[in-house]
């Protein structure tokens, strides 16, 4: 079993690097603005029809365009979800959502969170799934990548004032990257048996003579961008545990690769654009080391399972509760770490049924900001925030002004870095406290004790860090949780994006200084170790008290009793 686990991890990482490296080269060309003759006429036609000028923007113009674009997306999706009962492509005649659930869902999909307080097969029409959720899966992913593009340009350029054009970036990312790759992935999913139709639900009689309804729908097209764009919202309530969404071990492996593909490729692109591939490789090494350790811990915890099972007559202590037998413990553990290291949130098992230790690792990966590969775009700019913090700490230790890639990191940069790093922990801890201190918040907790606390902490961590997965023992389809989590998702998304763009605006104007004798090398093993230590230190200082009240206490209860 140990050999199988390491073989699975090694094969996953190998295929990931083989696929992401050439994609990184293509993304580097997009960042640098190289024209692509194949679609240049299509692009020019879009600018003429829309009346948008493709002149470059400064930092605040870029931020305003991104913010307005996403606010408009929230409004349009909210209206669609509220009125779906009166619109076509609704063969099951499903009514519109309640206003608070529609608001929660609109904010969720526009912010790339895809938190779902509903089950798709009995709540959403095909039109809402296709024109609403699937469209936002593309656009929210493009938003994150565009912000990463702007920050990469800020490091690569010097003595400049502009970061690119937000509209050009959004269109080119969608047209050249997301749509073609999503089409290929969708065809792979269809070949594996994922549904893709507009038929009405099938009403059948089982062998036992019981009536059963089989949901249909355009699943593969949404499933492809769900994983590629690290969105995570499932067409069905069971998400990727549903056999119509993720039917085989091969489709499961492809989903995991798709989740990490663009985040990993962006690291390669970063190194190419700044003119030093070692910088991108250092980020990948730091991310990979944390990721591999996390996977090993979850696999160990789930294989160890519950020590109380064998004395009760079970064949094994291993924890198969809430898992699909077609995937098994190893692939399920890998998927859980992939989806929470990235801001995806798709699940192929019930995270609420993991052991206390096995469930704590996905929770912790979200709490450190999902910087271990992370979401499309957000993973890279999140890790670069920790890079800036690391060089600042190193500068304090040796008494030098911190610098990164030849650019001095000043007071404003560090203020924005601190703001971006601290905004999500603040939301998580305050939101959890609010839920536990109010009657409306406590009413949703279905499990007592440490596990009930973990469910609330997981929900706020997932929402604030734009992940979307859940410990599903919490009743969240209430006005209190829908509004609380909507606020957490919105602030968690744009409370990081706006400081990142402010940092980019500051860095792009600076001159690049040649490296001196006292300059900290940022492409070697020493810096990789410092970076990992900084990520772990910030995560530990922020969340250890909360984790001690939840999963740590639950783990000790199980094993000390044994």
UniProtKB/Swiss-Prot annotation:
Report how it sits in the membrane. Multi-pass membrane protein
Q: Where are the membrane-spanning stretches?
A: 6-26, 62-82, 132-152, 175-195, 253-273, 283-303, 327-347, 356-376, 379-399, 416-436, 483-503, 526-546
Its main localization is: membrane
Please give one Pfam family short name: KdpA
Cite a GO CC annotation.
plasma membrane
Q: State its location(s).
A: Cell inner membrane
A GO term for molecular function: P-type potassium transmembrane transporter activity
Write the record's keywords in alphabetical order, separated by commas: Cell inner membrane, Cell membrane, Ion transport, Membrane, Potassium, Potassium transport, Transmembrane, Transmembrane helix, Transport
Q: Which InterPro entries does the record cross-reference, listed alphabetically?
A: KdpA (IPR004623)
Q: Which family does it belong to?
A: Belongs to the KdpA family.
The role this protein plays is: Part of the high-affinity ATP-driven potassium transport (or Kdp) system, which catalyzes the hydrolysis of ATP coupled with the electrogenic transport of potassium into the cytoplasm. This subunit binds the periplasmic potassium ions and delivers the ions to the membrane domain of KdpB through an intramembrane tunnel.
Q: How does it assemble?
A: The system is composed of three essential subunits: KdpA, KdpB and KdpC.
Q: What is this protein called?
A: Potassium-transporting ATPase potassium-binding subunit
């Amino acid at each position: 079993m140990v050999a199988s686990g390491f073989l699975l991890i090694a094969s996953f990482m190998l295929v990931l690097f083989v696929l992401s490296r050439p994609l990184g080269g293509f993304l580097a060309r997009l960042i640098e603005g190289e024209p692509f003759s194949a679609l240049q006429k299509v692009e020019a036609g879009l600018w003429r029809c829309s009346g948008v000028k493709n002149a470059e923007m400064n930092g605040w113009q870029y931020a305003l365009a991104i913010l307005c674009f996403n606010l408009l997306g929230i409004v349009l999706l909210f209206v669609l979800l509220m009125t779906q009962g009166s619109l076509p492509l609704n063969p099951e005649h499903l009514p519109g959502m309640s206003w608070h659930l529609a608001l929660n869902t609109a904010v969720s999909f526009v912010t790339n969170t895809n938190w779902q307080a509903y089950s798709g097969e009995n709540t959403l029409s095909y039109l809402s799934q296709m024109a609403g959720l699937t469209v936002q899966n593309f656009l929210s992913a493009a938003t994150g990548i565009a912000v990463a593009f702007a920050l990469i340009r800020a490091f690569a350029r010097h003595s400049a004032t502009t970061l690119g054009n937000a509209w050009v970036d959004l269109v080119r990312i969608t047209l050249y990257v997301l749509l073609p790759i999503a089409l290929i992935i969708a065809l792979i999913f269809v070949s594996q048996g994922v549904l893709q139709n507009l038929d009405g639900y099938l009403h059948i009689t089982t062998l036992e003579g019981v009536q059963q309804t089989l949901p249909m729908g355009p699943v593969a097209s949404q499933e492809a961008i769900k994983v590629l764009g690290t969105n995570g919202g499932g067409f069905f309530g069971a998400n990727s545990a549903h056999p119509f969404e993720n039917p085989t071990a091969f489709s499961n492996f492809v989903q995991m690769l798709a989740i990490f593909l663009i985040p990993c490729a962006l690291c390669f692109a970063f190194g190419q654009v700044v003119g030093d591939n070692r910088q991108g490789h250092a980020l990948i090494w730091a991310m990979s080391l944390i990721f591999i350790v996390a996977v090993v811990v979850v696999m160990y915890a789930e294989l160890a399972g519950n020590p109380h099972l064998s004395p009760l007559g079970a064949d094994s202590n291993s924890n198969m509760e809430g898992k699909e037998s077609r995937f098994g413990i190893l692939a399920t553990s890998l998927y859980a770490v992939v989806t929470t290291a990235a801001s995806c949130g798709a699940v192929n098992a019930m995270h609420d049924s993991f052991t206390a230790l096995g469930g704590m690792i996905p929770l912790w990966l979200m709490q450190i900001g999902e910087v271990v590969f992370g979401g499309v775009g957000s993973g890279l700019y999140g890790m670069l925030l920790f890079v800036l913090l690391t060089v600042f700490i190193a500068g304090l230790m040796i008494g030098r002004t911190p610098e990164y890639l030849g650019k001095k990191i000043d007071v404003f940069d560090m203020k924005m870095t601190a703001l971006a790093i601290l905004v999500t922990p603040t939301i998580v801890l305050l939101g959890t406290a609010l839920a536990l201190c109010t009657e409306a918040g406590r009413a949703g907790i279905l499990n007592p004790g440490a596990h009930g606390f973990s469910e609330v902490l997981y929900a706020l961590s997932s929402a604030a860090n734009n992940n979307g997965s859940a410990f599903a023992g919490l009743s969240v389809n209430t006005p209190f949780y829908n509004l609380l989590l909507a606020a957490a998702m919105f602030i968690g998304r744009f409370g990081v994006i706006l400081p990142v763009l402010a940092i980019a605006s500051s860095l792009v104007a600076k001159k690049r200084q040649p490296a001196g004798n006292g300059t900290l090398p940022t492409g070697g093993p020493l810096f990789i170790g410092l970076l990992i230590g900084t990520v772990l230190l910030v995560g530990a200082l922020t969340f250890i008290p909360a984790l001690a009240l939840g999963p740590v206490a639950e783990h000790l209860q199980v094993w000390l009793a044994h």
